[in-house]
């Protein structure tokens, strides 16, 4: 048997039938895991596991940079972003880079810079990943005790948790600083149809910020997804960043209490399951946010939300028929309800027809036409601006519907166009990934609990049929 760098390499779990197969010196014999078990071979090799994580970060950042440059290369300034299948440039535009009034792109150079910076960063991370995977020390405990750890060392684990929380808090403050001091962010609610502005009057009232968490997730309430002004969003990031940083300091300075030591499983696989569970919650929340929220995800870049496209259609035909002489206040539709306008269950004047179910939509092109009791009839007759008509006609024809083969629009519509909204892509992908991560959470939590309880993980390999077959090679 080979001389081991660290005695903690032994982790016998599975038996590979072909024991001679070795991969880069990390074989079944020395790790207890077969080559296909991936990072499980590195559970007790902190140096190699560091390499795997840094290399993975490099791949992520490389994708971001390459995809960013790909989108810049294909970008047509004359078309809205949401018509071009872009998923990265809308995020940069939302942060206020390269856009002017109405969400019009005035400069693509910041997008190019972003892509190049990510590519350069990915090269650094890639080098670090390869170095630690192949050349660096297998374990960090002996040479660099600050970066070393033992999975069951509860104090060290909460210290690592604290460092991560501080980094997340600093990330939240990066958005705050961008909005306050570095040019501002794009505000879809700015007068006249959206603009980049600095957020000066932050919402820091805890009753408002934490009130979102106490709202119902249904209907017009919408939990945190209902946030509809940037002051609240940036103020929320101040609160969240502060909580993360203070919580991080707390976890670095303290040891877990007895109830926490008893309640949790303290192993590498358990921490993996906790992380996957958290990411699953992030994915499901992001799905709801990108689907329903047109403030954090402005419609100028991501296309209209479903309710927004529906209300835009009602508005467009109200404008048309009013010009043709219809009395939109009293016209009756085929159901006996108002054809253009009707009353909501609570008495507000809302758009009639099928779009009545979306009556709690709020959108910057529509709100100026509301009064104290819903839509204001006199404003609908006298105050509609050309930009509102143009925008609603555009949104009406770009509903976030569409199939994977890029045939957009209503499924029964024969004149459908090649259009799938980025909202559809981002909401669907985050829902599906959130679900997969949840399954991964259950899987690894089950394995971690089984290991902690002391019963065998996996299947008994002693009498596995493949052990008695002739090797393929």
From Swiss-Prot:
GO molecular function: chlorophyll binding; electron transporter, transferring electrons within the cyclic electron transport pathway of photosynthesis activity; metal ion binding
Coiled-coil portions: none
Binding site for [CaMn4O5] cluster: 367
Topology versus the membrane: Multi-pass membrane protein
Propeptide residue interval(s): 1-14
One Pfam family from the record: PSII
Subcellular location: Plastid, Chloroplast thylakoid membrane
Cofactor note: Binds multiple chlorophylls and provides some of the ligands for the Ca-4Mn-5O cluster of the oxygen-evolving complex. It may also provide a ligand for a Cl- that is required for oxygen evolution. PSII binds additional chlorophylls, carotenoids and specific lipids.
Modified sites of kind Phosphothreonine: 15
Residues passing through the membrane, by range: 69-93, 134-155, 178-200, 255-275, 291-312, 447-471
Signal peptide segment: none
Primary localization: plastid
GO cellular component labels: chloroplast thylakoid membrane; photosystem II
GO biological process, one term: photosynthetic electron transport in photosystem II
N-acetylthreonine carried by residues: 15
Family: Belongs to the PsbB/PsbC family. PsbC subfamily.
Quaternary structure and interacting proteins, as annotated: PSII is composed of 1 copy each of membrane proteins PsbA, PsbB, PsbC, PsbD, PsbE, PsbF, PsbH, PsbI, PsbJ, PsbK, PsbL, PsbM, PsbT, PsbX, PsbY, PsbZ, Psb30/Ycf12, at least 3 peripheral proteins of the oxygen-evolving complex and a large number of cofactors. It forms dimeric complexes.
Function according to Swiss-Prot or TrEMBL: One of the components of the core complex of photosystem II (PSII). It binds chlorophyll and helps catalyze the primary light-induced photochemical processes of PSII. PSII is a light-driven water:plastoquinone oxidoreductase, using light energy to abstract electrons from H(2)O, generating O(2) and a proton gradient subsequently used for ATP formation.
Name by which UniProt lists this protein: Photosystem II CP43 reaction center protein
The organism's taxonomic lineage, starting at the top: Eukaryota, Viridiplantae, Streptophyta, Embryophyta, Tracheophyta
């Amino acid at each position: 048997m080979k001389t081991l760098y660290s005695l903690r390499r032994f982790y016998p779990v599975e038996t590979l039938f072909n024991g001679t197969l070795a991969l880069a010196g990390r074989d079944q014999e020395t790790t207890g895991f077969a080559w296909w078990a991936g990072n499980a071979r590195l559970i007790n090799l902190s140096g190699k596991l560091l390499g795997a994580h840094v290399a993975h970060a490099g791949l992520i950042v490389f994708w971001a940079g390459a995809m960013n440059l790909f989108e810049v290369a294909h970008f047509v300034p004359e078309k809205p972003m949401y018509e071009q299948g872009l998923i990265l440039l809308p995020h940069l535009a939302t942060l206020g880079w390269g856009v002017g009034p109405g969400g019009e792109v005035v400069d693509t150079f910041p997008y190019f810079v972003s892509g190049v910076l990510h590519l350069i960063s990915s090269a650094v991370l890639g080098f670090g990943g390869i170095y630690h995977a192949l050349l660096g020390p297998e374990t960090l405990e002996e040479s660099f005790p600050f970066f070393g750890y033992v999975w069951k060392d509860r104090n060290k684990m909460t210290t690592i948790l604290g460092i991560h929380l501080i980094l997340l808090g600093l990330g939240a403050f990066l958005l705050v600083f961008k909005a306050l001091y570095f040019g501002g962010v794009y505000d879809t609610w700015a007068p006249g149809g959206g603009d980049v502005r600095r957020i000066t009057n932050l919402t820091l009232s805890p009753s408002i910020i934490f009130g979102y968490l106490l709202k119902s997730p249904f209907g017009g309430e919408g939990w945190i997804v209902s946030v509809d002004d940037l002051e609240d969003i940036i103020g929320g990031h101040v609160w969240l960043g502060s909580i993360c940083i203070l919580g991080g300091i707390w976890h670095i300075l303290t040891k877990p209490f007895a109830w926490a030591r008893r309640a949790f499983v303290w192993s590498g696989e358990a921490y993996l399951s906790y992380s996957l569970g958290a990411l699953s919650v992030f994915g499901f929340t992001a799905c709801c946010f990108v689907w329903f929220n047109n403030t954090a995800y402005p419609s100028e870049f991501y296309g209209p939300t479903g309710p927004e496209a529906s209300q835009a259609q009602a508005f467009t035909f109200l404008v048309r028929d009013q010009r043709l002489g219809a009395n939109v206040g009293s016209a009756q539709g085929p159901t006996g309800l108002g054809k253009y306008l009707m009353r909501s269950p609570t008495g507000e004047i809302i758009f009639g027809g099928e779009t009545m179910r979306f009556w709690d939509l709020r959108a910057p092109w529509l709100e100026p036409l509301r009064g104290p009791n819903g839509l204001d009839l006199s404003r609908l007759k006298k105050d509609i601006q050309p930009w509102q008509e143009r925008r609603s006609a555009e949104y009406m024809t770009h509903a976030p519907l569409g199939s994977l083969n890029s045939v957009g629009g209503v499924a029964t519509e024969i004149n459908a166009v090649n259009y799938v909204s980025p909202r559809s892509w981002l909401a669907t992908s985050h829902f599906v990934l959130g679900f997969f991560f949840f399954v991964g959470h259950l899987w690894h939590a089950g394995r971690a609990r089984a290991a902690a309880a002391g019963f065998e993980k996996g299947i008994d390999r002693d009498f596995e049929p493949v052990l008695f077959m002739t090797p393929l090679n």
